[in-house]
């Protein structure tokens, strides 16, 4: 059995044991694609998969704004409240960190495996929720930058 198949099977097993349906499903899909020799589709996923995933994530977050039952005055009031302003700051910093994480992943895609293992540790031992590699990559980029400052 080839190494890639073993790694994918390991990811499926880790996803199952950590009760992470996302990881297990992604591993299954990649294994089926690999065994079916769908190389073109794998190449497309490698090049554009993150962008497509981000589009779907953005759509899911923006759906409430597309409904007509939102009271816009209330939305503005919530946004300008202390919690809303902190949410604006948090969103701004998080998207900046995610951008730095994306740069890091493009420069060194092998880091994703450590991030997956770290996510599994967070799920199993800290009760975390896996939201994807970008935040983990953003934090990794921040940690690497801090280490660079102290060298």
UniProtKB/Swiss-Prot annotation:
InterPro entries membership: UPF0756_TM
Keywords associated with the record: Cell membrane, Membrane, Transmembrane, Transmembrane helix
Keyword hit for Ribonucleoprotein: no
Membrane found in the keyword field: yes
Main location: membrane
Transmembrane segments: 6-26, 52-72, 75-95, 111-131
UniProt topology in membrane: Multi-pass membrane protein
Subcellular location(s) per record: Cell membrane
GO annotations of cellular component type: plasma membrane
Entry similarity comment: Belongs to the UPF0756 family.
HAMAP family linked: UPF0756
PANTHER family listed in its UniProt record: UPF0756 MEMBRANE PROTEIN YEAL (PTHR38452:SF1)
Name by which UniProt lists this protein: UPF0756 membrane protein Dred_1097
Organism (species): Desulforamulus reducens (strain ATCC BAA-1160 / DSM 100696 / MI-1) (Desulfotomaculum reducens)
């Amino acid at each position: 059995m080839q190494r890639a198949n073993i790694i994918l099977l390991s990811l499926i097993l880790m996803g199952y044991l950590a009760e992470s349906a996302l990881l297990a499903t992604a591993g299954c899909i990649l294994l089926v694609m690999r065994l079916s020799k769908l190389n073109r589709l794998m190449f497309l996923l490698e090049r554009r998969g993150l962008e497509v995933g981000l589009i779907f994530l953005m759509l899911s977050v923006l759906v409430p704004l597309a409904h007509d039952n939102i009271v816009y005055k209330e939305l503005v009031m919530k946004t300008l409240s202390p919690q809303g302003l902190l949410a604006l700051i948090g969103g701004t910093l998080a998207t900046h960190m995610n951008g730095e994480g994306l740069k890091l992943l493009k420069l060194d895609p092998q880091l994703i495996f450590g991030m997956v293992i770290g996510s599994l540790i967070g799920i199993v031992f800290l009760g975390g929720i896996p939201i994807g590699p970008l935040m983990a990559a953003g934090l990794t980029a921040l940690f690497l930058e801090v280490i660079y400052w102290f060298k």
